[in-house]
Amino acid sequence: MEKNLRYKLHKVKKQWVAIGVTTVTLSFLAGGQVVAADTNNNDGTSVQVNKMVPSDPKFDAQAQNGQLAQAMFKAANQADQTATSQVSPATDGRVDNQVTPAANQPAANVANQDVANPATDAGALNRQSAADTSTDGKAVPQTSDQPGHLETVDGKTYYVDANGQRLKNYSMVIDGKTYYFDGQTGEAQTDLPKTGQANQDNVPDSYQANNQAYSNEASSFETVDNYLTADSWYRPRKILKNGQSWQASSEGDLRPILMTWWPDAATKAAYANFWAKEGLISGSYRQNSANLDAATQNIQSAIEKKIASEGNTNWLRDKMSQFVKSQNQWSIASENETVYPNQDHMQGGALLFSNSKDTEHANSDWRLLNRNPTFQTGKQKYFTTNYAGYELLLANDVDNSNPVVQAEQLNHLHYLMNWGDIVMGDKDANFDGVRVDAVDNVNADLLQIQRDYYKAKYGTDQNEKNAIDHLSILEAWSGNDNDYVKDQNNFSLSIDNDQRSGMLKAFGYASAYRGNLSNLATAGLKNRSANPDSDPVPNYVFIRAHDSEVQTRIAKIIREKLGKTNADGLTNLTLDDLNKAFDIYNQDMNATDKVYYPNNLPMAYAWMLQNKDTVTRVYYGDMYTDNGQYMATKTPFYNAIETLLKGRIKYVAGGQAVSYKQDWSSGILTSVRYGKGANSASDAGNTETRNSGMALLINNRPNFRAYRNLTLNMGAAHKSQAYRPLLLSTKDGIATYLNDSDVDSRQYKYTDSQGNLSFSASELQSVANAQVSGMIQVWVPVGAADNQDVRTSPSTQATKDGNIYHQSDALDSQVIYEGFSNFQAFAQSPDQYTNAVIAKNGDLFKSWGITQFEMAPQYVSSEDGTFLDSVILNGYAFSDRYDLAMSKNNKYGSKQDLANAIKGLQSAGIKVLSDLVPNQLYNLPGKEVVTATRVNQYGQAKSGATINKTPYVANTRSYGDYQEQYGGKFLDDLQKLYPRLFSTKQISTGKPIDPSVKITNWSAKYFNGSNILGRGAKYVLSEGNKYLNLADGKLFLPTVLNNTYGQPQVSANGFISKNGGIHYLDKNGQEVKNRFKEISGSWYYFDSDGKMATGKTKIGNDTYLFMPNGKQLKEGVWYDGKKAYYYDDNGRTWTNKGFVEFRVDGQDKWRYFNGDGTIAIGLVSLDNRTLYFDAYGYQVKGQTVTINGKSYTFDADQGDLVQTDNANPAPQGQAGWKLLGDNQWGYRKDGQLLTGEQTIDGQKVFFQDNGVQVKGGTATDASGVLRFYDRDQGHQVGKGWYSTSDDNWVYVNESGQVLTGLQTIDGQTVYFDDKGIQAKGKAVWDENGNLRYFDADSGNMLRDRWKNVDGNWYYFNRNGLATRW
C-alpha cells in the first residue's frame, strides 16, 4: 500500500484543526486472514484496479475459521463498489505517489510493495466469532454471506471468493492449514519458506565478484559522514571496459552504487525501466521478472560502452540524478509536503533534529523550542492573545537556546552595529539602531542580550536621547509581545498590531467589506476616546510593510488570475509569475474600488501621522511602486502622504481628543490635536500653540452624505482663529495645501469665541476615486511659518525608573521609514542600486520628517529559490550573515554603496537601523547526516510520517566564508568591555551565554532543524533497518558491495532450518542477524540469533507483525477478533489519538486512532457522538448501515448518527447513556430516564423533563440559579463567555451563575434576556420603558450615535437611552 500524508482542516468537536491526510491502499487482516489490493505490476507501469473498499461490510454473526473475512470480501467486491483508478508507476514502496485502492491482496506478501524499510504481516492469531465482539471500537456483526472456496485446476490450488474471483497475493488459514496464494497467478504455495536450497538470486557470477567494492574503506566510496546515499558512487574491483572485458579499476574509476545494488526489488525494476526508456536496453520489467538480473547486467554493459564513447561519466551522473529524483523514496513525495492552504510550515514541511548514537556529531543538549516572549520559560506567561509564535520558521533554524549560539549572536550583533568600523575602517558608516526580525520565532533570550548590549555600549537606559539615538524596534506580531516588552523595561518598540489590523479593516478593504471606523478609537494599545491621557507600552504602527499586505495580495492574484490555485506566494513561484501579478496589481492600484491593492492609504496615513503615543512607520511601497527601479515611479498617493509628513512637522503636537460622530447611515471619525504646549482643550498655550494643532475628519464609505452639522472643539488656544485645509478629498482625488500660500482665503474656516470649529452637513460628504474612497479632511491653523517645526528633541536628563523607552513628545516626534520593498527591480546600472539612490536623497527624507531609516537587510542572498526571499534576493535568505555586500554586490549595491548610504542619511540627521535576522541560515554548502523527524512549525511530530528519527542529509555545514573570519572573533574583547553580559543568566536556559566555543563554522549541532529539502525519506541508503555505513565499528555494506574477494566460496545460502527455527544465509554465506531483509520482493526480520520472526515482534521501540511464513504486514489492518490494528508503511502502529484522513481510491476517508495502536471499527461513541467505522476502520458517512437487523443512518457531513429504528441504540461501554434522537442523549437509571440536575462521573449535568440532556443551553437548578451547560459535553461551566447550541452567547460569573439584564463586563455595557442570551444587533426596552440598542458585532450598548430601528431613527445619548429625531 502506498501512502502520501498530507494535512487539511477538519472539523472536530466544532473546532477546525489540522489533521494528517494519507493517500493509501489498504490491506486488512481479520481473524488470521489478510486482505489487500493487487494494484500494480511492480515495475513502474500502470494498471487498472477495481475499487474494493467496502462501504457496508457484511459479517456472519456465527462466522468461524475465516468466514468473517470471507464474508467481508464478498461485500468488498459488490458490483456497486467497482470503479477504476489509474495507478501511477511504482517507484518507492515505502512512500509513493500512487493512489492504489484497498482490495483482496494480502499484505502478508509484500512482493508487490516496494518498500525500503518493511512493514509487518500476521503472526498466529486467535480468532473470535463476530458475535462475541463488542461494538465499542470493534467490528459489528451483520448479516451473513456465503464464503468462498478452494478449487483445484490442473493440479494447482486456488481460492475463489463468493464472486468467483481468484484471490491473489493473499494468505489465510483454512481448517488449520496456512495457505498463501501467489500475487501473480493466485496459485497456492507452501506456507513456510523452503530451506536447505540456495536461492536463485545467490548464484555467483562475474558481475557479482567484480562489482564488489575495491575495498571496504571510505576511500572507495562517496559518502556523507560515512553514510552512503542514493547519489553515492564507489570504486568497484573491476570495470567492464567498453562493455566487453573486466579490467582492474583505477582510483578515478567510480560508478553509481545504484548500478550494482538497489534497496529493494521494485527499485531495481524501476532502474531497469528507466534505462529502457533511455534506450540502453529494451523491454519492461517487474520486480519478480526472471530476466531482471540479466537486464541490469545489460544496462551495465551498455553504460560502460557509452562511457568509453563519451570519454567521461558526466552524462551518467546527470542521468543517475534524474533516476534518483524520479523515485518517491528519494524525493519530496516521501517527505509529507503540505501545500496551500494547508501548509504546516512556510516551506511545505519542517524537520526537527534529535540526538542519536548514529549521528553523534549533530547531538545537542539544548534545542528548547518555542521559547518566544510568551513561553520564554517553557510555560505561558502572557494571555492577551492565543497566538504566540512558533519555532521553525524557515531554512536551517538556528538553536538560539544554546548558550554557545547565544554568545555567537552577541558577536554578530556587535559586528553588525560596528560594521563600518570593522569592515570599512570608517566609524561614520556604523549603524545606529536595529530592527529585530521574526521575534515570535526566536528564543526571547536574544532580546535580553540585545537590550543589555545596548545598555552597556550606548547607555540606552541612562537618558532618552541615548535610547532614541539607538532605537530598537521589534517585528513582534503577537499581542503578548507588548506585555513582554513592558516587563523587560520597555527596551524596544513593539507593534500595535490590533491598531494595524483595525486600520486594514476600516481603510484597506474593498468598500463592501470595510469595518466600522468607530473601532479605531479604541483598538490596540491605547483607548484614544475614553482614556486619552494613558501611556501605553512604547510602540510603532504601520498599515503595510515589505512582507505584510503585499506578498499575500500578490499571491492572491497568482491564484485567481494566473490559475495557480495552490500558490501561497512564498514557494514554487518564479519571477515571471511575479511580473505578471504586478501588472495586475499596479493596474488595480489605479482603480476606484480596489480588489487586490489596499484602498485608502492616504486615509490611513492621515490617521496614523496625527495620533499621539505611537510612532508611525512609513512604508516605501506606499510612496513608490513596490516593483520597478528604486524610487523611479511614484504611487498616486505620494503627494498626499508627503503633505501629511511635512504637515506633521509643522502642526502635530499637544494633547489629542478622538471621537466618532454617528450620522444616519455611517459616521465620522474625528481627531483634534490641540497644539504644542496644550495637553487639553482648556490649555491656553502660547503663540506656538496657536500656530499648531490639527483637525482630522474621516469617513470610509464611498457614498456617505452627512445629515447634520458637526462641531469640533479645537481648544482654548484657538479661539476666534482661522483654519485652512491641509488635505481635502475631492471628486478628482486629494487636494493638498502644505503652506498658507497654497490656499485661497475663501477656503478658510473660523473658530468661534470658544474655539469651536463647525462644519455644515453639506461640507461632509464622500467621494470615490483612485486615491480615496470616503472622505478625508485635514485642517490646520492659519499663521504658521513655512519652516515651523513643533517636534520635540529627546531629553538628556537621567532616566530614573529603569525603563528605556517612555511615551513622550520626543518619542512621538519620531517617524520611521522602511526604505525598501521586497519586490523592487534588480538594478540595471550601478546608479540604480538602492543604496546608491539612498545616498543621494538624505535631504528629501529629512524634509519628510524621517528620523529613523530602516534599511533592507544587507546580507548577500542565497539564490536557491526555495522561498520567496531567495527568489527576489531581498536579503532575508542568506548563507553567511557576516557577508554584507562583501563577497559580491547584494541586491542593494556594493559595500561602498552601503557605507555611502549610511553616511548620507546620518549627515542629514537621520539615524540608520540595521536589520538583525537571527533565526535562519539558507543552503549552507556542506552536507551533514542528521537524525530528523518530520514535524510542523511548532516541532510537533507528523503522524504517520516516514521521516521519524531517520538519518537525513541536511545542508548544515558552512566553510570558507566570512563566518570563518568573524565568527566569535569579538567575544574576548566584549568580555573585557562588558563582563556582565557574560554572567547574566538567561531566562530560558538558566545559564549565561557561553563564549568558550567560537562558531567559525556552522553545523547541525547548532540548529533546531531545517525545512524539508526534497531528498526523500530514504536518501540515506539502508538495507532493511540497517543503514549503509563505513564508519569504524559501524561498517555495514550489502552483500553485493561488500569486498569478500579471495575469501572461501560459500557452500550454501538462502533459508535454512536451524535450532528449531528458520534462518537465512546471504550470498556470502553470512547469516543475517538483527535486521530486516528483503528476499524475492518480501520483507523478513531475523533476530539477534538469526531466527526468522513471526507474529508480533518488538524491534527497538516499535512492534511489528509478521505472518507465519515470516512475511511482513505493512500499510494494513490486523483484526485479532477483538481489536483492529493499523500498521503503516513502516510496519508500525500509530499511538497518536484522534482522526486521521486517508486518501483511498480518490476519496477522502477517515479513521479514528485510539492512542494504543488500535483503530475504531463498528459502532462507536466518541465525545457523545455515535459514529460507525467499517471493517477497515473507515468512517461511514451518508449511508445507512444494518447491524443485527437494525438500521442506522449516518449523516454525510460529519458522519453522526441521525436516524435509527432501535429505541435504545447507545454504544456499549456507555453505562446508562441512551441516544434519544439526533444527538440527543439521556441517562437511564433503574429503568427510568433521569431529569433535572445530576452529577454523573463527577460532572454536573442537567436533563429536561423529557430526559434529554441540556447541551449548549441554560437551565435553572433546584436553588433557582440559572446555569449554563456547554455544547460539547453538557457539563456545567465556570466563569466566562460561552456559545450556545444556536450560536448565541451567555456570560457566567464567578459563582457559576448565568447573568441576565443590563451588565457591565470588561468595560462594555451589555444586555442578557431572562434566559441569559446576549442581545446583539437588537433594541431592548428595559423595565423603566427606556429603549437601548446593542451592537450586532460586540454587543456593546450604543452611545452618542444615531440608529435606525424598525424604520425609525433614534439618537442614543451618552447613557445609551434613545430619543427620537
Swiss-Prot record:
Reaction catalysed by this enzyme: [(1->6)-alpha-D-glucosyl](n) + sucrose = [(1->6)-alpha-D-glucosyl](n+1) + D-fructose
Primary role: Production of extracellular glucans, that are thought to play a key role in the development of the dental plaque because of their ability to adhere to smooth surfaces and mediate the aggregation of bacterial cells and food debris.
The Cell wall-binding repeat ranges on this chain: 146-166, 168-187, 1052-1071, 1073-1092, 1093-1112, 1113-1133, 1136-1159, 1160-1179, 1234-1253, 1278-1298, 1299-1318, 1343-1362
Matching PROSITE patterns: CW
Pfam family, one: Choline_bind_3
Region annotated Catalytic, chain positions: 200-1000
Alphabetized Gene3D superfamilies for the sequence: Aspartate carbamoyltransferase regulatory subunit, C-terminal domain (2.30.30.20), Cholin Binding (2.10.270.10), Glucansucrase (3.20.20.470), glucansucrase (2.30.30.420)
Activity regulation (UniProt): Glucan synthesis by GTF-S is independent of primer glucan unlike GTF-I.
Biased composition (Polar residues): 80-89, 127-146
Name the UniProt record assigns to this protein: Glucosyltransferase-S
General remark: Synthesizes water-soluble glucans (alpha 1,6-glucose).
GO BP annotations, alphabetical order: glucan biosynthetic process
Alphabetical list of InterPro entries matching this protein: Cell_wall/Cho-bd_repeat, Glucan-bd_rpt, Glyco_hydro70cat, Glycoside_hydrolase_SF, KxYKxGKxW
Molecular-function GO terms, alphabetical: dextransucrase activity; glucosyltransferase activity
This protein's UniProt keywords: Dental caries, Glycosyltransferase, Repeat, Signal, Transferase
NCBIfam families reported for this sequence: glucan_65_rpt, KxYKxGKxW
Family according to the record: Belongs to the glycosyl hydrolase 70 family.
Enzyme class name: transferase
N-terminal signal peptide: 1-36
UniProt region (Disordered), positions on chain: 80-99, 127-152
E.C. code: 2.4.1.5
